[in-house]
Amino acid sequence: MRVSDFNFDLPDELIARYPKTDRVSCRLLQLNGENGEIFHRTFSDVLDLIDQGDLLIFNNTHVIPARMFGRKASGGKIEVLVERMLDEHRFLAHIRSSKSPKEGAELFLGEDKLGENNGIKAVMKARHSSLFEVELSDKSTALLDVLQTIGHMPLPPYIDRPDEEADKECYQTVYSKVPGAVAAPTAGLHFDKNLLEKLKAKGVNFEFVTLHVGAGTFQPVRVENIEDHVMHAEYVEVSQEVCNAIIATKKAGKRVIAVGTTSVRSIESAALSAEEFGNPDLIEPYFSDTSIFIYPGKKFRVVDCLITNFHLPESTLIMLVSAFAGYKNTMNAYKHAVQEKYRFFSYGDAMFINKNSNVRELE
């Protein structure tokens, strides 16, 4: 298939630049992946769509304030976006500047918050393709503490506004736990603590995986045929406890419901690993990077239902949804969402989708 097959017209006013005040009050488009049937709901209705004994899989990654502003020793301004923390003092980052810093260049970070000539000193140690390896000069302060002091919440480029104090809470799931993401697993933003308590009281089971969402999630697909696209790598943790819960849920005839595409990619990576290594179990623990790319024709081994936001045209995420619900069903649902003026992207509305069982084997 061609990347252009996943394009659609989206009026700018449908891009949500601020979240709803009440997390569960957003709209929910329910899509039956088997027949394409559509229902218009409110997100709080998921309480009626999820049954006792079903298993919800959440991504518990915590978004770090990964964007920093500063300057090079030469005086040139820089914008630094942490992609991955390597240890307490080193990180990989995207750096925007008029001229890329060279190996050994000194950087001064956070002067927009700390004042001129008071920036935190760092050194560009090496370049790895499009990423820069940076090390803090002062080893007495950990990177996470530095980010809490001078970092900005890394809002996606399409939100097109500076981050605000409220984003520290709004652009974070209520169950986030493990620091490391530079983008939120946005489907989870719609759950508040009250809804989680109601689901638990109903007998719905919860498990948590970790996938640290990278800035690569916003990168455009630059090839013509989707099969030629190479996904960026992101770190994933799927524990034995999660695997046991998934296997037990399947044996009981209940559904595994992934909250967000990152949860899908996490557990499907673990299931694919089990198959490739000849593990007789459906899924096995997974603690590694994944670059799994799911597009129409790929097989889902575990996930039965998906809760997800509305994604960018021609993105790998709309391709994943198309693989799950069927291409025609997905594009038709997006057409309806635009007509009905749903809000799109990270701070927008959501979908609840059950899988289209008519999919080919993963090649």
Curated annotation (Swiss-Prot):
Entry EC no(s): 2.4.99.17
Pathway: tRNA modification; tRNA-queuosine biosynthesis
Keyword S-adenosyl-L-methionine annotated: yes
Family from the record: Belongs to the QueA family.
A Pfam family annotated for this UniProt entry: Queuosine_synth
Catalytic activity: 7-aminomethyl-7-carbaguanosine(34) in tRNA + S-adenosyl-L-methionine = epoxyqueuosine(34) in tRNA + adenine + L-methionine + 2 H(+)
Subunit composition and interactions: Monomer.
GO cellular component, as recorded: cytoplasm
Keyword Transferase: yes
Places the protein is found: Cytoplasm
Ranges annotated as spanning the membrane: none
Role, per record: Transfers and isomerizes the ribose moiety from AdoMet to the 7-aminomethyl group of 7-deazaguanine (preQ1-tRNA) to give epoxyqueuosine (oQ-tRNA).
NCBIfam families (alphabetical): PRK00147.1, queA
GO BP, sorted A to Z: queuosine biosynthetic process; tRNA wobble guanine modification
Gene assigned in the entry: queA
Location, primary (coarse class): cytoplasm
UniProt source species: Haemophilus influenzae (strain 86-028NP)
Protein name per UniProt: S-adenosylmethionine:tRNA ribosyltransferase-isomerase
Keywords: Cytoplasm, Queuosine biosynthesis, S-adenosyl-L-methionine, Transferase
Gene Ontology molecular function: S-adenosylmethionine:tRNA ribosyltransferase-isomerase activity
HAMAP family hit by this protein: QueA (MF_00113)
InterPro entries per the UniProt record, alphabetical: QueA, QueA_dom1, QueA_dom2, QueA_sf
